[in-house]
Amino acid sequence: MTDVTIKTLAAERQTSVERLVQQFADAGIRKSADDSVSAQEKQTLIDHLNQKNSGPDKLTLQRKTRSTLNIPGTGGKSKSVQIEVRKKRTFVKRDPQEAERLAAEEQARREAEESAKREAQQKAEREAAEQAKREAAEQAKREAAEKDKVSNQQDDMTKNAQAEKARREQEAAELKRKAEEEARRKLEEEARRVAEEARRMAEENKWTDNAEPTEDSSDYHVTTSQHARQAEDESDREVEGGRGRGRNAKAARPKKGNKHAESKADREEARAAVRGGKGGKRKGSSLQQGFQKPAQVVNRDVVIGETITVGELANKMAVKGSQVIKAMMKLGAMATINQVIDQETAQLVAEEMGHKVILRRENELEEAVMSDRDTGAAAEPRAPVVTIMGHVDHGKTSLLDYIRSTKVASGEAGGITQHIGAYHVETENGMITFLDTPGHAAFTSMRARGAQATDIVVLVVAADDGVMPQTIEAIQHAKAAQVPVVVAVNKIDKPEADPDRVKNELSQYGILPEEWGGESQFVHVSAKAGTGIDELLDAILLQAEVLELKAVRKGMASGAVIESFLDKGRGPVATVLVREGTLHKGDIVLCGFEYGRVRAMRNELGQEVLEAGPSIPVEILGLSGVPAAGDEVTVVRDEKKAREVALYRQGKFREVKLARQQKSKLENMFANMTEGEVHEVNIVLKADVQGSVEAISDSLLKLSTDEVKVKIIGSGVGGITETDATLAAASNAILVGFNVRADASARKVIEAESLDLRYYSVIYNLIDEVKAAMSGMLSPELKQQIIGLAEVRDVFKSPKFGAIAGCMVTEGVVKRHNPIRVLRDNVVIYEGELESLRRFKDDVNEVRNGMECGIGVKNYNDVRTGDVIEVFEIIEIQRTIA
């Protein structure tokens, strides 16, 4: 086509030259009126004009839908609501050039996918070939080694080797085939994933082009997070692909719970698709916790103290309390979640549930305080501690009284010792410390305590009485403490004394005299005349010299509480026997559950002393409370730490006591069922010293029977106070004072409440009166006593009473309205009541032996001749406590 000028073209288009020049300028072509126009320029102008004159690039359709909704209202009326739904949709006309560009991009993307697919396939084939080659090389190497190893047995193994080789080649081929299949499957999955991503990206680009500008700006962070997750997924795949050899085949295999098998974006898309609606479009991912429930039980290290509650044990093992209770029930123990159990039980339960137990020592503070003591190094000889034991009234206190040249026995109630007396005596050959123990049965614990704190036991046996029960008990205590025994045969001055009998009786219990080849010294003494006292002291010192008794004299003291009581003016008082070290006034002592500073010390004569060495008994003042007899006394440095240790011991004692109280034991079930049928004697006991409280409590508790039980409601050391009287009134108890009295306020309460208050100074009287009170609570014993026998001689019929037996009274007396038994051939066939008794048609109340009478038995007519009617009565016999 030839070129035309602007003027010619303007004439053809029927427009002015100026307008055509302006249109060329708008199309980007500068022309004047005389210039020529080429065909290409003309086409450019036509395209420009078509685009300018064409319709709009964007078409928006709006649609409105109106409807009416009836809503039920109050009072049964319905309400109409007008609803208008507006929908808006925009269509965009694409530019041909833009369409060509998108088509080119789509083509490039497909080519990239094909290229990636080919590369992945080639890579998988190379890896499979290398894997097969490596396995074949290793197989060949193993075969060569086996061939060298079995060269001497080639003939026998040729067939097996060929079969093995064929099998291995087959396995290698199978492995290669599996590797290729895995690679192919991975390649297909990768291709599907790439295609899915491309499709999703195309959809996103499409909707991104159509979206409003405000929406683009609001989705900026979403798009950024998507790209970040895609980059993270890509890096994860690269890391997984580079780890180890032959991991590609394993990675292609889908695993349960594999979090990296698909990208995070895919997982979020799946969750959004499930939700649906507008929420289906992902707006961003929240932080998610990847916690998984443990698949197996976690075994823990459980630290257990000396006591622990069931709930605390469950928390340490990270299980529910009900599981611990079930485990304890399987082991045969019933417990509640707040019950305190001991360390051994907790260890068994924890080990039963599969945990490792670590036992913790809770007395570290106590050990630290005990170790921080200044004890001397040099041990020096010390005086022996001698305990005088024997049966009651065998002369123990009188013997010691003669040694001390004082009258101690006159001060004891009833002439019997009821406390442990501690005295030290200076002799010509040295000093001796004596402990005088009670002899009667109630003071077993005091006697055992004396044996534990002693070096030598002097066993006093009366020559006229011989070996008695408390003598045997004293021998057992001495043997248990492994203490040598010196026998003092007392009352040798009496005419009926028989020392040889004492030797024979003691030999039955392992106490042999030296002249018989034994180890015990026998000394004949008389506490009344003073015979043999010097020989006894020499025997004691000789035995002490054999024992080589030594103790550290310097340093902090330690010892034992022999006796303790509460003095109204001085407070808690403890009799302490020092074992080693020197006890000074002002020392800080730790004594069982109590502690304090020694404010004063007195010897057995009541004199103030400033210090006491080994084997010296003293009374100390200043403790926080009355200690238990037998407690260890230790001097410590720090009063604050001593207080902490004392409080810790109190708490531990309480916890252990609670742990041992099994409220739901099966063996107590029947006892609890019959508890309402048992009478109780409640007692509030107060005594002057701790040892007497123990002895009386034990003796009273031993009096309990199946029908009457003794219950010690409260006990203590010191006088009877208003609190004790109030406790006795509340529990309906008997107030018992042993060598103590009630104060004025307590007496007012006792008079107002009319309480039973009893004072005693001898334990025998106390026990006898409690026995009498218990006997009054016993139900009387019913006894049947036969009072007469009557033999049936004949039987008559009476219209009023039926069969009447004509009888002869053969024994005793037959009384009217008494219970009877009918005996036939000495076998009881009926038991009932005698209804009618007549003699010569007259009603009588009784018929004596040898007389005839008529007897009518109530509700019984089968009386025969020859039967015997036995008449008896029931009497009540009051029982007593043995």
Swiss-Prot record:
Chain ranges of the tr-type G domain: 381-550
Post-translational modification N6-acetyllysine, affected residues: 800
Keywords (A to Z) from UniProt: Acetylation, Cytoplasm, GTP-binding, Initiation factor, Nucleotide-binding, Protein biosynthesis
Cited PROSITE patterns: G_TR_2, IF2
Tagged with keyword Nucleotide-binding: yes
Positions of region (G1): 390-397
Source species, domain of life: Bacteria
NCBIfam families from the UniProt entry: IF-2, small_GTP
Name under which the protein is recorded: Translation initiation factor IF-2
